[in-house]
Amino acid sequence: MSVSFPTIPSDLRVPLFWAEMDNSEANTTQSSGPSLLIGLALSDSTIAKNKLTIMPSAALAGKVAGRGSQLARMVARYRAVDPFGELWVIAVTEPDGETAKGTVTLTGNAQASGTLSLYIGAVRVQAAVVTGDAPVAVAAALAAAVNANADLPVTAAAAAGVVTLTARHKGLTGNDIPLALNYYGTVGSENTPDGVNVAIVAMAGGTGSPSLATTVAAMGDEPFDFIGTPFSDSASLATLALEMNDSSGRWGYARQLYGHVYTAKIGTLSELVAYGDTMNNQHISAAGYEPAVQTAVDELVALRTARNAVFIRVDPARPTQTGELTGALPAPAGSRFTLTEQQSLLKHGIATAYAESGVLRIQRDITTYQTNAYGVADNSYLDSETLHTSAYVIRQLKSIITSKYPRHKLANDGTRFGPGQAIVTPAVLKGEMCASYRTMERAGIVENFDLFKQHLVVERNVSDPTRVDVLFPPDYVNQLRVFALLNQFRLQYSEETA
């Protein structure tokens, strides 16, 4: 017998035609690249806490997690960028701690009718003001307008001309709900009515972060390529870093799940630099935003996670720079990080964003990895695209080997077996690796085939005759990050002489 049949017996005598299926050469499946968002749900919501829940729409998130909840808002922002991709969520248990509060104090009687425009995050809340309105009346109208929008992250109460805004959840993330008056200003036809004075005290006082240990357990061994979390405190990220590690975590050989964590932090340059210096993990990207950014940090996380998901699913090696964070309001002009400040952030493990024509965009999604085990500067894992490319390459190889050689015998090179036999040799596997590399080269994932082939090693293990050891040395295609040009001008070229 030459051809290897998985099930048809070699001694079959019953006539006549017998066929079996073999799909080993047909697999062309690509990973769906599912995403995961971690966030808080309202205490009276119906969603199960610390359980994986698939989330196809923002409407469903509002229904099960509660409108205005952190999780519902994150899903809404995510779906604004990625309406198609597979999305899962985990609703975490609210932490022990305090609830963030902010105030809007109104003074002076209105001397003209108009509209008060208060921005809570990226959402504008408007209250009508009539000539002669006292602060108490204006405050009551503003509080009513806030409470009329169930999708806001805060509730409002008015007393003696002061509107107190209270976050819907306890915890640190409530401090990062920005408040602003007339974001677009006079140019955008936003003006405070004459006679009305408004003083805003930013959201503050929120304390506590949820324990993510149960959350991580709920993730199980389900693959998630893009994991968004608004909890950027050290303890929360340490828990996720442990889950992502290269030894026993999602990037370890025994699990092979891969994925990347996206989080964000709002702060001054010095605060963000100090924050970046506390981390050194290639599987986490922490984006830094200016104190004046007019979008809640949890929504920024969801937007950035979604934008990466959309881009990386299409091409893991293509840079995510310029990706629009749809619906986010950037810090006003004059309050944004300068080029020098952005450079400092990128030198300290903080991913950056920039604003162009009022649109907030990804500038560079670096990881927090900065130094090797000896504390020496190391740029091998600088960009998150490198990690996504690595996952893509490994999955491609795994798909080929597990599809084409699931039940093969192993022999030495030069063994004279008949055609059709389910036997593989190191040389055959090396050819398979080279063919796969060529395919990925045409797809723009890798480069330098000749050098790759020169350094590729495929050999039988000297101690275990059933094992093949492979040294796979891919050269990843890089991203165009910097275009440097020296404009060496002339006033006029001299004519050449014969």
Stretches with model-predicted labels:
Residues 1-86, 321-326, 332-334, 339-344, ...:
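Structured, hydrophobic secondary-structure cores that serve as assembly/anchoring elements
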Residues 36, 79, 83, 122, ...:
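A glycine- and small-residue-enriched flexible loop/hinge signal that marks low-structured segments
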Residues 57-63, 109-178, 227, 246:
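Extended, beta-strand-rich, solvent-exposed assembly scaffolds of outer structural proteins
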Residues 97-110:
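Disulfide-bonded cysteine-rich modules in secreted/extracellular proteins
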Residues 108-112, 116-120, 184-211, 219, ...:
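Bacterial flagellar/type III secretion structural subunits and associated motility module proteins
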Residues 119, 173-189, 486-489:
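Extended Gly/Ser/Thr-rich low-complexity repeat segments
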Residues 133, 158, 206-214, 418-425:
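Surface-exposed ligand/attachment interfaces on beta-rich extracellular proteins
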Residues 136-143, 213-216, 237, 241, ...:
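Extracytoplasmic/secreted envelope proteins and their assembly/folding machinery
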